[in-house]
Amino acid sequence: MAIRKKSVDTLPDVASDFVWAVSSGSHHEPHSLLGAHPHEKGWVIRALRPMAKSVSAVVDGEKVELSHLENGLWQGYVASKKVPDYRITTAYQDGSVWTTDDPYRHLPTIGDLDLHLISEGRHEDLWNALGSHIHAVKGDLGLSHGTRFAVWAPNAQAVRVVGEFNSWNGIAHSMRVMGASGVWEIFIPGVGAGSKYKYEILTRDGNWITKIDPLAQHTEVPPSTASIVTESTHKWNDKTWLDARTKRDALKAPMSIYELHAGSWRQGLDYRSMADELIPYVLELGFTHVEFMPLAEHPYAPSWGYQVTGYYAPTSRFGSPDDLKYLIDRLHQAGIGVILDWVPAHFPKDEWALARFDGQPLYEHADPRRGEHPDWGTLIFDFGRNEVKNFLVAN
């Protein structure tokens, strides 16, 4: 592979405080420094590789050597009329060499319409806009597969993604804030389904706190608390039941509900094995519906599940989200409707969850007279805030 030297005499200067903020993962817009940026008749490429011996950008089959600026920031020049599709090759002191895609060369993966609807509190599929989602970006070098992350944290000074893929060191994956929306975003190539992650949030008072993803659709089995990137492969087979439901007059049709707590109905069952035992039992008793006590993720196993920490994630105690879909699918195929108990009244104060999510009251009302439940020791949602209403209604 040919090595191309930079073809300009000077590269743009970067203020040391700017470099420090980005290299420490505490800048609100790391993409404004890292990635590819226009310079003279080409592009300057910058990458953050603090422990590197040498760094180069692979462009059009050639290596463009990057020079070390300071504090782990490397930069080099590429003569190109269009934004180059490139990869970063990093050599370390131990002799290892890694070639990876650069998260900071990618455009935002959340659009202006999404941000507008979120701010107005009327995004009907919020779970598709925020959270973590498998994503692919097409470029000259082919598809770049990874995961897009987006989280609402309007009071944060900076937000980083930490996970197994970066050894729980978020400096490599600082997010950018999307204008005044309070939404932070990044696309991380190479991160796939099953990856565990959390968010590191720099609060107004300068402290870093670690939080779960409020829109995560899969979590670790408690007492572990990490969010998990997930991708559904379930194929629904309940069309017959859905069609019949649309034709039925629910106000005139008979209805009898069997309520159960999944954790104690019969011991040792998961979502899939529950289908085999629950369906014949409910049919024999003549019930038309089953109502599950809260299945959203909650930290305290002996409870009924009424203190929820993961509103968009079914509890992992009984399997994956697709396993729950399998159970619901089987119930529908048997002609049994499904009701899920929902808990919008309050949420717990666990420091790793929704409470003071970005260092300030966010999901809870700021006035403790309206934001705290003195009898239960829990927090009450700020129902007057658009984004919070959207979080609940979309759920």
Where are these regions (language model features)?
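The feature marks proteins involved in alpha-glucan
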Residues: M1-E40, L69-A153, M178-E259, S264-L269, ...
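Glycine-rich, histidine-containing beta strand-loop boundary motifs that form or position
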Residues: A47, V59, V151, G163, ...
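Short proline/glycine-enriched turn/loop motifs at strand-loop junctions of beta-rich domains
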Residues: L48-S54, W152-V159
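Short, surface-exposed loop motifs enriched in S/T, G, D/E and P with embedded aromatic residues
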Residues: E62-N71, I171-G179
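Beta-sheet entry/capping signal
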Residues: G146-A150, A158, T288-H289, G335-G337
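Substrate-binding/active-site clefts of carbohydrate-active enzymes
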Residues: H218-V221, K235, K239-I257, H261-N395
